[in-house]
């Protein structure tokens, strides 16, 4: 299973925000510059993360974006569930003749649940706390 770029960059944006010193806000432009991604794409990602409560956006002259809650309460599995379409096969297709007897969807569903259960063991803080090599790469020391 490969995550979509939407989920990948959503996780990267959260990692960047979690790596910043406490209280420091950033901007979508700054995040897109760090990861060299499309600003339009990142706006959509940040909007969805904001709707889900993972990010808070503050308007105005001193505004910006920051984590919506502490990094140690943001579960990676929850972020992936929010951003990633997790249906691996389309069993509603009228062209699939084995749908009535197929067990593939159930097997794939169990695999996805195992994947998410493992990600549930990690918080955003687990990925960034005391990770000096990461801080150096992101230039946030």
From Swiss-Prot:
Nitric oxide-sensitive repressor of genes involved in protecting the cell against nitrosative stress. May require iron for activity. Residues 2-129 form the HTH rrf2-type domain. Residues 28-51 bind DNA. Its cofactor is [2Fe-2S] cluster. This is HTH-type transcriptional repressor NsrR. GO terms for molecular function: 2 iron, 2 sulfur cluster binding; DNA-binding transcription factor activity; double-stranded DNA binding; iron ion binding. Keywords: 2Fe-2S, DNA-binding, Iron, Iron-sulfur, Metal-binding, Repressor, Transcription, Transcription regulation. The gene is nsrR.
């Amino acid at each position: 299973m490969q995550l979509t770029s939407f989920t990948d960059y959503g996780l990267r944006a959260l990692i960047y925000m979690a790596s910043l010193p406490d209280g420091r806000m950033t901007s979508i432009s700054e995040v897109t510059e760090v990861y060299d991604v499309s600003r339009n794409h990142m706006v959509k990602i940040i909007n969805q993360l904001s709707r889900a409560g993972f990010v808070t956006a503050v308007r105005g002259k001193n505004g910006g974006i920051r984590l919506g809650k502490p990094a140690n309460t943001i579960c990676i599995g929850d972020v992936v569930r929010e951003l990633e379409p997790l249906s691996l096969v389309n069993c509603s297709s009228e062209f699939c003749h084995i749908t009535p007897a197929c067990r593939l969807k159930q097997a794939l569903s169990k695999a996805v649940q195992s994947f998410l259960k493992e990600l549930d063991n990690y918080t955003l803080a687990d990925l960034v706390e005391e990770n000096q090599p990461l801080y150096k790469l992101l230039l946030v020391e």
